[in-house]
Amino acid sequence: MPARHRDVLASSCEGRLTVTRHPDGCLLVYPRPAWESRRQHIAQLPYAARALQRLLLGSAVDIELDSAGRILIGSELRAAAGLERDVMLLGMGAHLELWDAARLAEHERQALANGLPESAADFTF
């Protein structure tokens, strides 16, 4: 875990995290208190969202930063996200995304080729 994230996580949630799958093919890493709030919201989704509930809730695993600031991701989650040697950790506000570097590059290439979604039409840089 990079120092800038490790220090915040150690102070905000005592290094207690929850990791789960994301439909885009990465892993979501939440501070445990933020995950508990998110988990309740996911559990209340309508029946039509059962597949998403299974993905997010059924894959969720509680982990902790070790004394060296590392996290151990189990083989099932590593395989689901295609995590190989090179990984990228992206800060996304209240959570982090953990990507296989090659998968992220391809995902970004496709997203840029498709252009901004209509919902971001008013966004300016």
Language model features with spans:
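Conserved "turn/edge" positions that cap or connect secondary-structure elements
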Residues: L116, A120-F125
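A short beta-strand-loop micro-motif that forms or neighbors metal/cofactor-
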Residues: S11-C26, G82-W99, L116
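Positively charged
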Residues: C26-P33, E97-P117
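Acidic (E/D-rich), amphipathic helical modules within compact regulatory domains
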Residues: M1-Q40
